[in-house]
């Protein structure tokens, strides 16, 4: 029996079993009780696009680094911070400090920001919009997972009161490793966003044409979270509602105005109005595209259109008490634009009263176009832009805070009605000053009935087209909105699609990515564990090989006490 006990302790199986149990206990004990080891969340990448060979935004998308706090001077790390902490930080210096990635947490509900915070947030957006960096920059909503990640990162970055505590923290503290899914920002060569064109025909090929134009894509510092409800969701909705309202006048030959009307939803408006440029090129060439031919519409029906005025609509959904007519120069008195302006001012004087102002801005051929109408003006086609924004540099134009809650539906409906009344008055050649030229006669006669602009329909259009991000770099979102736009517009007029060839510019994908934050021990901790295991095995081997005499003496003592 003595030999059997000695052989049992010398057995390699016992050595292997003890080693395995020790390793499992050490690994399992390295994590805190109840702690989530891995957290997965969605993050949204800082914008990236190229115009005239210049790349703006962040050029990288891949994240696979250890997380550190703001201001840490370390290379190949992911700097994790909140938007409030960035307010007092030199963003340009932050790009220079890190060569890995940046993760910024923003409020989960932006509607809850007060006026002071909104202004601060817009100031931060301006810095991010002008950024040019090689880092992978992501933004994520602030939630419970963000609180946990920030706590671990900040705890590890805090300086311990003593050197020993700092050493122990470095050896045993958790680190956060953040990785991203491997997606390429390069869009497939086959991807081309679409222009959607609807038409109401007067039945006369020689009849002049009025064109309504609105780009449907969105853009901000973080396009994946920007629904662009006002810019330019309100423009999309305005064109759809105007199409629905004006189509009733074209249902019967007896009420059909002597004008053709085009409704053009253009792609890549935030990319120097690529869709508008493409449509103008097609228009001047006579629409020879294959997509146009597949529409089954008469080619002559479009190529013979003489555009008297292109009315571009952008951001008309905020309550500002009126809007602006933007033009390249002051229109001549008898021009269509001048007549439209006078009619807008007349109808704006009827309740509810609004203020309509003309704003002129010279067109620059060496920079990107400030307004959509400039693309028409460059080709010597008359065009104006109607907008509540006084300037193309207004920060609300490309803001994450351009949310559906910021829209005033009643204001949008009033503006749509005002535009519809003015255009109807022009194409039907009604008196500019109302039904009577006698100033003593007061009348509020209008062409549209009280409920012509349908509130429920406008509300539905806002939910469908102005409540979701639709950056041109998101192929799925772009294809979805163009499909829905074409489907809705086809219910009121003839519609065709035209694939847009983007030139002198480039859009990039990966507007949204999946990030994984994993809690791991530092690499030096593994060395300490390895040293401990080696020490244990050495001690166990020594005891196992030198314990025969001890065991024999113990067995002899037990046998003697028994017998």
Swiss-Prot record:
Taxonomic superkingdom = Eukaryota
Q: Which residues lie on this side of the membrane: Cytoplasmic?
A: 544-563
Q: Which GO terms describe its biological process?
A: protein-containing complex assembly; regulation of protein targeting to membrane; regulation of signal transduction
Q: Which PROSITE patterns match?
A: EF_HAND_1
- Tell me how this protein sits in the membrane: Single-pass type I membrane protein
Report keywords, A-Z: Endoplasmic reticulum, Glycoprotein, Membrane, Signal, Transmembrane, Transmembrane helix
Record keywords: Kinase included?
no
Where do the record's glycosylation annotations fall on this chain?
A: 232
Q: Transmembrane residues, as ranges?
A: 523-543
Subcellular localization(s) per the UniProt record: Endoplasmic reticulum membrane
Pfam short name (any one): Nicastrin
Role noted for this protein: Involved in the recognition and selection of protein complexes to exit the endoplasmic reticulum (ER). In muscles, regulates levamisole-sensitive nicotinic acetylcholine receptor (L-AChR) subunit composition, possibly by allowing only specific L-AChR subunit combinations to exit the ER. Specifically, may promote the inclusion of alpha subunits unc-38 and unc-29 into L-AChR. Regulates L-AChR sensitivity to agonists such as nicotine and levamisole at neuro-muscular junctions. In touch neurons, may prevent ER exit of incorrectly folded mec-4-mec-10 ion channel.
- Summarize subunit and interaction data from the UniProt record for this chain: May interact with the levamisole-sensitive nicotinic acetylcholine receptor (L-AChR). May interact with nra-4 in the ER.
Question: What name has this protein been given in UniProt?
Answer: Nicalin
Task: Supply the source organism for this entry.
Answer: Caenorhabditis elegans
What gene, per UniProt, encodes this protein? nra-2
């Amino acid at each position: 029996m003595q030999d059997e006990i000695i052989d049992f302790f010398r057995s390699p199986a016992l050595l292997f079993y003890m080693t395995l149990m020790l390793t499992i206990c050490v690994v399992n004990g390295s994590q805190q009780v109840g702690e989530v080891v891995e957290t997965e969340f969605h993050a949204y990448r800082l914008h990236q696009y190229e115009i005239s060979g210049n790349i703006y935004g962040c050029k990288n998308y891949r994240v696979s680094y250890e997380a550190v706090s703001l201001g840490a001077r370390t290379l190949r790390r992911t700097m994790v911070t909140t938007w409030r902490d960035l307010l007092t930080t030199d963003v340009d210096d932050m790009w220079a400090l890190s060569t890995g990635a940046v993760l910024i947490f923003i409020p989960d509900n932006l509607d809850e920001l007060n006026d002071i915070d909104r202004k601060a947030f817009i100031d931060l957006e301006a810095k991010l919009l002008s950024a040019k960096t090689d880092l992978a920059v992501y933004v994520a909503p602030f939630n419970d997972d963000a609180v946990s990640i920030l706590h671990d990162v900040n705890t590890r970055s805090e300086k311990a009161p003593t050197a020993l505590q700092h050493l122990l923290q470095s050896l045993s503290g958790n680190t956060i490793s953040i990785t991203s899914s491997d997606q390429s920002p390069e869009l497939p060569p086959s991807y081309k966003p679409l222009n959607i064109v609807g038409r109401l025909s007067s039945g006369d090929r020689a009849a002049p044409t009025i064109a309504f134009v609105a780009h449907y894509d969105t853009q901000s510092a973080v396009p994946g979270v920007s629904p662009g409800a006002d810019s330019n969701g309100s423009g999309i909705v305005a064109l759809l509602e105007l199409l629905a309202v004006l189509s009733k006048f074209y249902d019967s030959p007896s009420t059909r105005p002597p004008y053709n009307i085009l409704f053009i939803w253009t792609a890549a408006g935030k990319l120097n109005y690529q869709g508008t440029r493409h449509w103008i090129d097609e228009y001047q060439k006579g629409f020879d595209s294959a997509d146009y031919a597949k529409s089954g519409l008469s080619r002559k029906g479009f190529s013979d259109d003489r555009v008297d005025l292109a009315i571009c609509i952008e951001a008309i959904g905020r309550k500002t008490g009126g809007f602006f007519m933007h033009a390249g120069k002051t229109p001549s008195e008898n021009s269509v634009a001048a007549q439209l302006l006078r009619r807008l001012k007349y109808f704006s004087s009827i309740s509810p009263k609004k203020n309509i102002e003309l704003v002129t801005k010279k067109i620059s051929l060496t920079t990107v176009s400030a307004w959509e109408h400039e693309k028409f003006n460059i080709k010597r086609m008359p065009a104006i832009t109607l907008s509540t924004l006084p300037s193309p540099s207004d920060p609300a134009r490309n803001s994450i805070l351009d949310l559906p809650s910021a829209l005033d539906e009643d204001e949008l409906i009033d503006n749509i009605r005002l535009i519809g009344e003015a255009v109807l008055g022009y194409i039907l050649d009604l008196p500019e000053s109302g039904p009577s030229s006698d100033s003593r006669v007061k009348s509020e006669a209008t062409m549209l009935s009280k409920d012509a602009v349908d509130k429920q329909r406008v509300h539905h259009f806002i939910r469908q087209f102005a409540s979701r991000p639709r950056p041109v770099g998101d192929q799925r979102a772009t294809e979805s909105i163009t499909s829905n736009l074409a489907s809705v517009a086809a219910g009121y007029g003839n519609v065709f699609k035209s694939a847009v060839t983007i030139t002198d510019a480039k859009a990039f994908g990966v507007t949204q990515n999946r990030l994984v934050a994993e809690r791991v021990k530092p690499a030096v901790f593994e060395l300490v564990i390895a040293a401990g295991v080696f020490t244990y095995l050495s001690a166990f081997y020594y005891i196992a090989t030198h314990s025969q005499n001890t065991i024999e003496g113990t067995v002899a003592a037990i046998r003697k006490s028994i017998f």
